[in-house]
Amino acid sequence: MPQAVAGPEIERLIQLLARMPGLGPRSARRAALQLIKKRDTLLGPLADAMRVAADRIVVCTSCGNVDTSDPCTICRDAERDPTTLVVVEDVSDLWALERSGAVKARYHVLGGVLSALDGVRPEHLNLASLVERVARPEVTEVILALNATVDGQTTAHYVTESIRHCDVKVTRLAHGVPVGGELDYLDEGTLSAAIRSRTAF
């Protein structure tokens, strides 16, 4: 086991940072040093923000979004289209759609996708409340905004079967050529999806 090069408090900071997605031990050490160097302008404010987040952030019991209120800001927004429900895997997907400005509907966060490999089964996801929400008379369309992975596709099929008894239109995001993309750089699966999802011009 490598010998610690700093005091236990700094080593603990490094170990906690290394648990973050995308940060390994080396990156965590660099991040810790940067935080320590900028103690007044970065470390202190970050620690304060994290304390507030730990105390005030809650999961919306309606959609699964994270916010400082329950129901969340999106669920309380009267300007949102109540007839459309956008199903996403995780909060990060919800945030990405919100940044695009293309969605003015309500969301439902599943909290993951079905995965035989990882042992994720339907009861591990936020599916029961989705079926309840879709059964409401105001909902007329469900948009499946799930990733185009094997697990994402499996989950999309499962969700579709789970809400088949509801009188709603089920759509999913188009897959294919990204804006600004060149065909020569795309993989065969993406090109096949683009051909199948082609639209009139």
Swiss-Prot record:
This is Recombination protein RecR. Keywords: DNA damage, DNA recombination, DNA repair, Metal-binding, Zinc, Zinc-finger. One of its GO terms (biological process) is DNA recombination. CDD domains: TOPRIM_recR (cd01025). A zinc finger (C4-type) spans 60-75. Pfam families: RecR_C, RecR_HhH, Toprim_4. Belongs to the RecR family. The gene is recR.
